[in-house]
């Protein structure tokens, strides 16, 4: 459904469809090259459609990957927080050094930053996906 919406809203596809209409309007079987112009415009339209599908699929996969990454970073943050609790107890009992304790604190801070970064990546990917549904896609097809 979202892909259909993206194809419907794509300027690139509209542009190539317009070129096909224009080529058909200029078509005259008695004039050399007009049949080739129609065929060329149709081929360009097919390539544009494939390019939009590929770009939309890539955008969708990016959102999925970012969701997975965010979940993994949250799990890593939870583990770092548990490790810090353990390190706190060990430090208070004199089992580990202050450096080891501070490294556990740093690991928690790093994990929190990684979660924030993953969240921002997901947010960006989702916004790109929403724009893709509106037909704003980065494609490799020539304009």
What are the roles of these predicted feature ranges?
Residues 3-48, 70, 77-80, 101-105, ...:
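Amphipathic, heptad-repeat alpha-helical/coiled-coil signature enriched at exported N-termini
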Residues 26-31, 52, 88-91, 136:
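Secondary-structure edge/capping motif, primarily at the C-terminal ends of alpha-helices
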Residues 42-53, 141-143:
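Short, charge-rich amphipathic alpha-helices with coiled-coil/heptad character
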Residues 52, 59, 94-98:
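Alpha-helical heptad-repeat coiled-coil segments that mediate oligomerization/polymerization in large
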Residues 54-55, 69:
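C-terminal structural cap/anchor segments
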Residues 68-115, 130-131:
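Charged, solvent-exposed structural "stalk/scaffold" segments
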Residues 117-143:
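Acidic, low-complexity, intrinsically disordered peripheral segments
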């Amino acid at each position: 459904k979202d892909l259909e919406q993206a194809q419907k809203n794509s300027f690139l596809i509209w542009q190539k469809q317009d070129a096909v209409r224009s080529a058909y309007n200029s078509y005259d079987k008695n004039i050399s090259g007009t049949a080739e112009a129609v065929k060329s415009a149709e081929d360009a339209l097919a390539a544009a459609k494939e390019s939009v599908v590929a770009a939309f699929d890539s955008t969708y996969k990016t959102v999925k990957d970012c969701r997975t990454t965010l979940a993994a970073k949250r799990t890593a943050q939870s583990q770092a927080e548990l490790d810090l609790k353990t390190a706190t107890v060990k430090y208070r009992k004199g089992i580990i050094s202050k450096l080891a304790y501070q490294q556990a604190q740093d690991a928690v801070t790093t994990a929190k930053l990684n979660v924030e970064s993953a969240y921002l990546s997901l947010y960006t990917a989702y916004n790109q996906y929403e724009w893709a549904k509106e037909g704003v896609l980065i494609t490799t097809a020539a304009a």
